[in-house]
Amino acid sequence: MSILPSFGFTQEQVACVCEVLQQGGNLERLGRFLWSLPACDHLHKNESVLKAKAVVAFHRGNFRELYKILESYQFSTHNHPKMQQLWLKAHYVEAEKLRGRPLGAVGKYRVRRKFPLPRTIWDGEETSYCFKEKSRSVLREWYTHNPYPSPREKRELAEATGLTTTQVSNWFKNRRQRDRAAEAKERENGENNGVGGKQSQRSPLDGVKSLMSSSEDEFSPPQSPEHSSVLLLQGTMNNPAAPAYPMPGLGAPHPLHGMQGHPHQIQDSLLGSLTSSLVDLGS
């Protein structure tokens, strides 16, 4: 433990002052203290001093200096969470200033993808939704055996994963909700498939027939005299023996002796008679 020349403090004492000022939130005073340190490479490479410099740089909005510090020194694992927080928050602030609006969850995700954590403050293990994959594996394994852990089990899981009890509780709650939603969707799809199978057994013409009949009933235009005559003709053709209804101006229909059983001859005779009658009406 050697006293730094022309300063009066040891390196350990300087590191202790940096830690105390950080924990107390006295960042302006911490900045002045760092500025007063002598130009000693050994001192300025101390991890507590570098961490204090990073905190002050973020506090003052000097993000370029912050990134330089975080990328140039291999920080200890126990300091990774704090340094990662500074890295991400700084990039979030820059992105919000550039876009002119706060970032949502998707925006923050894109920033993290664009500016991944440097290996100096990251152990290289993939994280998902802020949980390390190792922690998620422990939670998934427990969930398969018991989706409803007791408070004591949640505390034990929190210790095993490095998470808080609240984080563990929220993870199980969200997982149960996702599973229930997936089961409900599967049931809905199964019911829809069953209904579709029953409908497919019906004739595809059933719906068309009902649609055509309803459309004809609702939208039929008023019948003209010519249309009425055609309907009369059709009825006579369907039942040649039935007498035709008398129409004003029309004579009695011609007898059809000897023509039964010959639809084409009956049709030609009726058409000729009807045409003559219509011509007489028009004259």
UniProtKB/Swiss-Prot annotation:
Domain of life: Eukaryota
Keywords of the record: Activator, Apoptosis, Cytoplasm, Developmental protein, DNA-binding, Homeobox, Nucleus, Repressor, Transcription, Transcription regulation
Record field: compositional bias (Basic and acidic residues): 179-190
Compositional bias segments (type: Low complexity): 237-248
Knockout-associated phenotype: Morpholino knockdown of the protein disrupts both skeletal muscle development in the trunk and cranial muscle development. Disrupts myogenesis by interfering with the proliferation of dermomyotomal cells expressing pax7.
Organism the protein comes from: Danio rerio (Zebrafish)
GO biological process per UniProt: apoptotic process; regulation of inner ear receptor cell differentiation; regulation of skeletal muscle cell proliferation; regulation of transcription by RNA polymerase II; skeletal muscle fiber development
GTP-binding as UniProt keyword: no
Keyword check for Nucleus: yes
DNA-binding region(s), chain positions: 124-183
Name this polypeptide is given: Homeobox protein six1a
Function: Transcription factor that is involved in the regulation of cell proliferation, apoptosis and embryonic development. Depending on context, functions as a transcriptional repressor or activator. Plays an important role in the development of the inner ear, where it promotes hair cell proliferation and inhibits proliferation of neural progenitor cells. Required for normal myogenesis. Plays a role in the development of fast muscle fibers throughout the body, as well as the development of craniofacial muscles.
Spans annotated as Disordered: 168-264
Subcellular location: Nucleus; Cytoplasm
